[in-house]
Amino acid sequence: MTHQKRLSIPRSWKAGKKGYKWVSTTRPGPHSQARSLPLGIIIRDILKLVDNSREGKRILSEGKVLVDGIPRKDLRFPVGLFDVITLPLVNETYRMFQDEKGRLALHKLNATNVNKLCRINNKTTLKGGKVQLNLNDGTNILGSNEYSTKDSLILSLPDKQIVKHLQFKVGNLAMVVGGQHSGEIGKITEIREVKSSRHNTVAISGETDFETIEDYVIVIGEDKPEIRLGGEVIE
């Protein structure tokens, strides 16, 4: 297993820098290392299901931990923003969020049958004119031209069928997932297109009014969030 010293872990990891000298790194996958946590760290340090890697490998090999409804058996599997972790044996479900300091944290959910929120990062035209939607968690699904980049989708799990389409537009509710306003939620009041190499910006009104770059904004609902926010934070 590939490891790194705990003092060098990415800032987005909420795992403390004390205790174990070495932590496992994430394997290349649906999320970058900077924006994900290894499944092994989650089940050992956060959920405290196991005491060591050997125990972790055993419960994963037995299919006791699901990510987005699929059993994952790799301690280094990357778990990122809005991913859903389910523990069927104890009927517990968690969603990965990002706090105001940009750190990833698990929120415990009351329901076990939950949906997944994803942002459309890109669109690809396939042979025959079919449109493929490339989502922020690495998922690729077939769609149509009614969907635009930066729109969000609510997907059922584990089949990832589109349940609802949320447009990236003024008036919709959004969460900021980067920069100094990370973790804040508010209504989009303006989308400012910059005709240069600089980033487009988005004005948001929440507890305060602020502006952030477009890439940091993910639509989470229209009048209300389409995914449950809050809940017990597991640290």
Swiss-Prot record:
UniProt KW RNA-binding keyword: yes
Task: Please report the stretch or stretches of sequence annotated as the S4 RNA-binding domain.
Answer: 37-100
Entry keyword Ribonucleoprotein: yes
Keywords from the named record: Ribonucleoprotein, Ribosomal protein, RNA-binding, rRNA-binding
The primary gene name is rps4e
- Reading the lineage from the top rank, the first entry is Archaea
InterPro entries xrefs = KOW (IPR005824), Rib_uL2_dom2 (IPR014722), Ribosomal_eS4 (IPR000876), Ribosomal_eS4_central_region (IPR013845), Ribosomal_eS4_central_sf (IPR038237), Ribosomal_eS4_KOW (IPR041982), Ribosomal_eS4_N (IPR013843), S4_RNA-bd_sf (IPR036986)
CDD domains linked: KOW_RPS4
Give the family from UniProt.
Answer: Belongs to the eukaryotic ribosomal protein eS4 family.
The GO annotation for biological process reads: translation
Protein name (record) = Small ribosomal subunit protein eS4
Which GO terms of the cellular component aspect does the record hold?
cytosolic small ribosomal subunit
Q: Which GO terms describe its molecular function?
A: rRNA binding; structural constituent of ribosome
